[in-house]
Every structure is written in structure tokens, then in C-alpha cells.
Amino acid sequence: MRTAVLLLLALAGAPSLALAQTGYIPYFGKNQIRYDNFQWHTYQTEHFEIYYYPEIEPHLERIAGYAESAYQHVSSELKHDLSMKLPLILFSTASEFWQQNVQPGAAQEGVGAFAEPGRYRIVMPIDEPPDLLYRLIVHELTHQFQFDIIPTGLIRRNMPLWVFEGMSDYMTGYWRPLDIMTVRDAAVSDIVPKMSEMEEYGGFSNPRLIYNLGHAAFEFM
């Protein structure tokens, strides 16, 4: 059912949204400085090819377990399986994550992780509490399912941002208290925009509002 809803939303999508905006807030005017030389290794699971370096090895099986659990959850909810293993690129800390060069400019302060559509890669740090880390994986993994389900080309480009981000937040099954507060505040203040106006971050003083209103819309559906 949710797969059908997603495809219908794609067909009815509002005008253009660049895929480069779906995983993170655009980042301009800064250079990424690399301080570390990471020694990469790979670890295979049923659905992931995990890239890690020695500092991450003590946590590797735990993270792999989170990833596989997240896959089963998203796959079951969307009634869809991916035909390939997903590259999952791990960094030990946020500061090391900011040095990534998978998608130049994608990692910055305030960005917890990102999903890269071209090669279906997920890039993230692991220095979060277990429950938050699991939800982060679910969110980014949902993006990869979206990229796989929604046809490429014109239809995918027309997907509004609230669909991509709202659905990914909805799939985590969790509301942060601050996020639900922003939704209530928008409703009480009568400033909830039309869905056709929730296509990009522009015009919103709080970029999280796009995520939160989209989350609320999927919860309603």
C-alpha cells in the first residue's frame, strides 16, 4: 500500500526538485579539509557492503545488525526488495564524516548522514546513541528505497521534498519532542503551507519544518 502511495505521489508531484537536495541541505562556499588518511576495509552482510576503517571494527557487528534490521523494517513496510547490496560507508565521528569526499559538500555541521542516489551509497558517522543511530540508518535507507521504487527521469525530479524527507522520517516511527512542537506551532499559528509550497527549503526559517510537516502528512495517510 505504501509503495502505491509513493508512486501516486510521484505522478502527482509538484514542480521540480533536484535529487541533490533530498539527502541534505545544500552547502556552498566552504572547502573540505582532510586531516586523516583512512585505511578502508569491507564487510559483507546480506544486503550491505560496509566500508569501515580499523577504529570502527569493535562496533562493526553491532552496526551491521542495525543495518540489516533497518532493511527488514523498510522492506516489509514498502513491500519492496532491492536487487543489489547497498554500500554503507561508516565514519567513527562527525568530524571525520565531514572529511568525506563521496559527495563533495554533502557533509557539514548539522547534517547527520546522507544518501547518495547515483550509486546508492549511504554515508554516516556512528558516534550516536544506539536508538538514534538505528533511526538514522532507517531514514537514509528509506531514501535508497525511494530512489529504487520511483522511476528515474522526469517523475523523480518532480517529487516534492516533503515526500522524500517526510516519508523517511515517518519510517523511523519516532517523533522528536522539538519536531512535533514545530508542527503544533505551525498549526496553531495557521502557517501550515500548501503541499505545493513545500518543495524546497527556501522560504522556511527552520529547514526541519519540511521534514516534520511531511512526517505528519504520512502519519495522517
Feature annotation, model-predicted:
Residues 14-20:
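Sec/Tat signal peptide C-region and signal peptidase I cleavage site
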Residues 168, 214-221:
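Alpha-helical scaffold elements that line and support the substrate/ligand-binding pocket
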Residues 15, 161-163:
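An amphipathic alpha-helix/helix-turn recognition signal
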Residues 164-166, 172-178:
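Carboxylate/His-rich catalytic cores and anion/metal-binding grooves
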Residues 3-14:
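Sec-dependent N-terminal signal peptides
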